[in-house]
């Protein structure tokens, strides 16, 4: 699905996860000449879902992964070309904390940069697949509200399966 997105400037990449990282090795292979920085926002006192605790036990850690808080990404303003949040942002259960995370993502993103968020949605296909487990996910409306509050616009939504959405986001550059 990454091949179908117009990604200009892929020198400085960030992949942010909740400690369950299935994607950094794949991203580095895809963008071999890039500078990929990987951050893990997992905080056992705030992110208490049992599924993420189990997943962390079996996940490989990408070399150089740094632990961060959702409220502070240790990067300069406007320094990142592409920021990935791949099946991770829904682990931030608090609306306020999720807004802090996306405000930080917006802050570090270059003017023409992209944020790619991959998530299940709280919708009919996911209800049919996960039954009440779909309550772990957020609706498109909830995501859109978070993006709006972080000064990020939804450029495109791509359904790469009936169950998964890719949100292609851009920073709204104030004049």
Question: Which role does the model predict for each range below?
Answer:
Residues 1-10:
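Conserved alpha-helix/loop element of class I SAM-dependent methyltransferases that forms part
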Residues 6-7, 31, 109:
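A generic alpha-to-beta junction signature in SAM-dependent methyltransferases
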Residues 12-15, 19-72:
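Class I SAM-dependent methyltransferase SAM/SAH-binding core
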Residues 68-83:
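A short acidic, Gly/Pro-enriched loop at the edge of an enzyme's catalytic core
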Residues 81-96:
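A short SAM/SAH-binding and catalytic strip from SAM-dependent methyltransferases
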Residues 96-114:
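A short glycine-rich, Lys/Arg-flanked "PGG" loop and its adjoining helix->strand segment in the class I
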Residues 114-168:
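C-terminal alpha-helical "lid/dimerization" subdomain adjacent to the S-adenosyl-L-methionine
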Residues 168-175:
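C-terminal lobe and adjacent flexible extensions of AdoMet/dcAdoMet transferase-like proteins
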């Amino acid at each position: 699905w990454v091949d179908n997105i117009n990604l200009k400037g892929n020198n400085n990449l960030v992949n942010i996860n909740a400690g369950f990282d299935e994607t950094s090795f794949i991203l580095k292979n895809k963008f071999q000449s890039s500078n990929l920085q990987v951050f893990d926002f997992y905080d056992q006192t705030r992110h208490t879902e049992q599924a993420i605790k189990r997943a962390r036990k079996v996940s490989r850690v990408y070399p150089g992964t740094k632990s961060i808080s959702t409220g502070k990404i240790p990067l300069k303003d406007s320094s990142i070309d592409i920021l990935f949040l791949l099946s991770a942002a829904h682990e931030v259960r608090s609306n306020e904390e999720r807004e802090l995370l996306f405000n930080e993502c917006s802050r570090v993103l270059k003017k023409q940069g992209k944020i790619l968020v991959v998530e299940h949605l709280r919708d009919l296909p996911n209800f049919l697949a996960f039954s009440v487990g779909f309550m772990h996910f957020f609706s498109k409306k909830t995501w859109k509200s978070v993006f709006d509050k972080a000064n990020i616009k939804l450029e495109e939504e791509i359904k790469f399966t009936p169950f998964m959405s890719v949100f292609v986001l851009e920073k709204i550059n104030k004049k």
